[in-house]
UniProtKB/Swiss-Prot annotation:
Pfam families: KH_2 (PF07650), Ribosomal_S3_C (PF00189). Binds the lower part of the 30S subunit head. Binds mRNA in the 70S ribosome, positioning it for translation. One of its GO terms (cellular component) is cytosolic small ribosomal subunit. SMART domains: KH. CDD domains: KH-II_30S_S3 (cd02412). This is Small ribosomal subunit protein uS3. Keywords: Ribonucleoprotein, Ribosomal protein, RNA-binding, rRNA-binding. Residues 38-106 form the KH type-2 domain. Residues 237-268 have a biased composition (Low complexity). HAMAP family: Ribosomal_uS3_B. Belongs to the universal ribosomal protein uS3 family. Residues 217-268 are annotated as: Disordered.
Amino acid sequence: MGQKINPHGFRLGITTDWKSRWYADKQYAEYVKEDVAIRKLLATGMERAGIAKVEIERTRDRVRVDIHTARPGIVIGRRGAEADRIRSELEKLTGKQVQLNILEVKNAEAEAQLVAQGVAEQLSNRVAFRRAMRKAIQSAMRQPNVKGIRVQCSGRLGGAEMSRSEFYREGRVPLHTLRADIDYGLYEAKTTFGRIGVKVWIYKGDIVGGKRELAANTAAPAGDRPRRERPSRPRRSGATGTTATSTEAGRAATATADAPATEQNQEG
């Protein structure tokens, strides 16, 4: 099941949080429809901004929208003109006062949505899909918090008549482990042969007790580990591995081996 389901939905309430935070009783369907419209509005015309995710939080008379982007200058615009335009359109859509927060993504190579968007842009520019996938994997694995990545492309790859799927993976990507912090991104590339779907999974370590544990940081250096002494084992005989003193033949062999030493001591 972990191979098929969306990693964010699979871990909701365990290691991931909701991207829409509000409560509604009879207006639930209306709010869900508004959230979809808000995200669609921010996605159209903002392809170059590199939007990683959009978080929506509602109160009784206000809607707060947090835009996580790799290029905040494009979203803000010259002297804030683009941000004002987005805010006015959101207020017209929701009918409430909108608080718009634009947050910069520091590490774009470690965000699955931005990696998928970068691969899709290269496919639209006629770059070979294998080269684009390998380049994205190499850039992501150079980041210190990335422990594994998987990139998959599906569609008419290379202009082939029959569509297929290919993926490359490096490092660990434990999709079925609930404590694993897995970032997931999906983007579609529009090519002359049709659309090609790009999916990216990025593993960033385990989350235990609300804290991320990285294997590289938790492992102790080899020189600092205390050495354990191996407990002494009884002498074994034969290919069967039986203890020498546990059989009649073993006891007889032991008595025969000890006899010459006893006789020498008596003669001395």
